[in-house]
Design a protein with these regions (language model features):
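Terminal amphipathic alpha-helical/low-complexity segments used for targeting or macromolecular assembly
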Residues: 1-52, 171-196
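Short arginine-rich
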Residues: 26-28, 158-163
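Flexible, glycine/small-residue-enriched loop-and-beta-strand segment within the central core
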Residues: 32, 59-143, 169-171, 175-187
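Short-chain dehydrogenase/reductase
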Residues: 131, 149, 165-167
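Conserved catalytic segment of ABC-fold P-loop ATPases
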Residues: 145-148, 161-163
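Short glycine-rich donor-binding/catalytic loop of glycosyltransferases
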Residues: 153-154, 159-160, 171, 177-178
Length: 196
């Protein structure tokens, strides 16, 4: 049950988790030209994965992606870490920079519960057409709306709405995505390619 305290070191849980991690090991051991094998392994590993998804190895996931649901056209750069003790839902056309962490697991603040190694989990939801910058960390229970940009190095502790640029530690909305973003893209450089 989402949000409920439990002991993750239970032997039955650990045995099941190890089976999932075996496939993740195989994925990370693939050679660069083995694209079809990578795609087949992701279909076995993930709860759901759409077309044209690409994850640069190494991928790290507590359950090897078993609780991960990716839409189509998702790209993840090196070292994507998915703490998938609960479900992670990702829409279409999402880009993860290198070294991004999406964590569904947390631990209580109360020292006695931590001494017992108690844990809780909360689903994470990331909308479509979201860009998550390098080194960002998304924490349990967070929802990020469609068309949003999460800046590099951000720590996302609370929900972020659709259509904004959000940055920082903790991550906060910097500004809405607006007309200026259809004219310039990086340090005032003019967009000179056709827009959709």
């Amino acid at each position: 049950e989402e949000g409920r305290l439990y002991l993750p070191g239970d032997e039955a849980i650990m045995a099941e988790q190890m089976d999932c991690l075996e496939k993740q090991y195989d994925y990370n051991a693939t050679r660069p030209h083995e694209q079809e094998r990578r795609a087949a392994l992701l279909r076995e590993m993930f709860a759901q994965i759409g077309e044209n998804c690409y994850i640069e190895p190494p991928l790290h996931a507590n359950w090897g992606g078993r609780h991960v649901h990716f839409g189509s056209g998702v790209y993840a750069n090196f070292n994507l870490t998915l703490v998938d003790d609960a479900h992670i839902y990702v829409g279409d056309c999402v880009v993860f920079g290198p070294n991004v962490t999406v964590a569904t697991a947390g631990h209580p603040i109360e020292p006695g519960l931590r001494r017992q190694a108690m844990q809780y989990n909360a689903d994470v939801r990331i909308g479509s057409n979201v860009s998550v910058g390098a080194g960002a960390v998304i924490l349990p229970g967070v929802t990020i709306g469609d068309d949003t940009v999460i800046g590099a190095g951000s720590v996302v502790t609370k929900d972020i709405p659709a259509g904004v640029v959000a940055v920082g530690c903790p991550c906060r909305v910097l500004r809405p995505i607006g007309p200026q973003d259809r004219e310039t893209y990086f340090r005032g450089r003019k967009i000179d390619v056709p827009l959709e």
